[in-house]
């Protein structure tokens, strides 16, 4: 026989339609976003993982100063690897960006054509899709270097450049000012061959089964290569940021978004629990009568759980539909807006269904069952008498009669709803944390750019490069080349100052190993103004990231060797652009046995124009130093708006639902005050103002809590995700903005609650009179 209680469900839904509609919307949007994200993330991760085999991605690469001879290549391949040429040339374009030109790769690191066609004739080029998007280029447009104009025939994704790192040691990839492209073999040969980089990819004959074995194989291979040729750089695949940064980032994003889902579900479940408790209080007489009539506690628990679970299921269903259609494209667009990923096919994600549908329903069931089981343990007689307290009657908190009647009344309202306000506080902390992150990142990036600009070592840092001929087999050629290099790197620029440099790596630990540039500067340097003496200074970025203070010792290692160096820190130099170490030029040259006259580059405040371009390895200027903030702004700028909107939505829902409960809980008292002649405005001052006071206090209390939490989150994110360091700087106006957003949100909700107070009838006070 059907239970008559089912007939109550439509009436309960109608009477609480506003509450259930709001909860349904937030659940559908939250589950839709998470489902869309997990489906897009899973599909793109599948495409990313499959690309290693589909596009035959290299197991690593190495660079040499000169092209390998057939004999050298044969000797290296005796180490159970296959070596492939993958030469490239970097050139500046007239739009201010740098392009890395490749020939089309047909054996290793194959190319995914996203749009258009591959270049077939001279003057045609296929550019990276991400670079094209960021520079507003499309098929049919042209790009130009100093000598030639290329017409874009296709947009591509290079399988070994899913993240556009110009240098593997860079803190962040740069898809705005750096790109990769494919040209015909004829056009490649026509480029400046002086700048060709002899880059070689290798593939193991037998793939290593584990990462540990891969590391061992890479170390053995590097030692074998060192006996054959001088290696300029050696990067096994597992260390290649251009390949693995994307996959690692997608994996970490997934964990974060799942945690977000469960936190929202838990908050909503507790809100449901409180609303159900309020319903039980309102219907205490009915529940007592039903229990006395023979209905069991189990039947009533199932009845009151029905609507929350049904709403959760419908919200999950609608959310999944949105996730697999509209929102999947939004989430995929975020990844395509950051990374040069190949095309993907949407795949069914059973794990996403479990996480976004089954788990939220289980959370709702467990929390609501627990609350209902606890609330319905009282006897039927107690429900009929409306005595819902399991303990002795609480004594009212004594309030001084010196306080005005309105103030005392508001305090009573606050004390009566303390549990609701605690849940509200949790909701405010969570929403504020999201809002904090959304407002903080643009502010941090802007401050980082300003900080870099203010404390650059020099407007230009020129790193010199020894020509290939200087390390050839012929001693005479080497001597002549070094003499030409010595004369060719002299400059008449009056702002130029020599420095020596050496690169070491940090010891991996809490953070992954990263490159550290050691600068050797002149004793009376006009650029590095520090009392170096025989001591060592570290940059503020180094000190902040690794929490090093003057007097501490730091240990660094050779990148491709096991040799280590330990230095005692004399002081911290105000430079946040890189993880760096400073010492005198004589000390650096002596420490690394470089020769007393050795120098590696120039500091300068104006461009150096009298050094041959072939001797300049790289130029570090403001554009190079701010690539981190520039790329993060491009990658995450749109996402921050989404985060802010989501935070405001959480604010409104939690405040609306709990404010609504407080009004309903006090409906009889509100009705009585109307009978006594109080106006709607005066009643609003009693109830709405009470909640407003609590909201203001909770908003203010949440700020220091969120600051502590954000410091921890930001540090972990920087240590695990990036090389280099960005200082966490919180603009004071962010606190004002967070407070105003929370307060304005409550004002908007208060207007809705004022309408609800106006609708409370006077005869409500005559009902349920004991």
Predicted segments, located by residue:
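Membrane transport/envelope proteins' first extracytoplasmic loop
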Residues: 2-269, 278, 332, 337, ...
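Short coil/turn motifs that cap or connect alpha-helices
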Residues: 138, 296-297, 379, 549, ...
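Juxtamembrane segments of multi-pass membrane proteins
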Residues: 62, 405-545, 549-552, 556-558
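Hydrophobic alpha-helical transmembrane segments of multi-pass inner-membrane transport and secretion
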Residues: 15-44, 249-288, 306-323, 354-366, ...
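Short cytosolic juxtamembrane segments of multi-pass membrane proteins
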Residues: 3, 377-394, 755-770
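Short, membrane-interfacial amphipathic segments enriched in basic
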Residues: 1-7, 392-408
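Short helix-loop junctions at transmembrane helix boundaries
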Residues: 317-355, 697-764
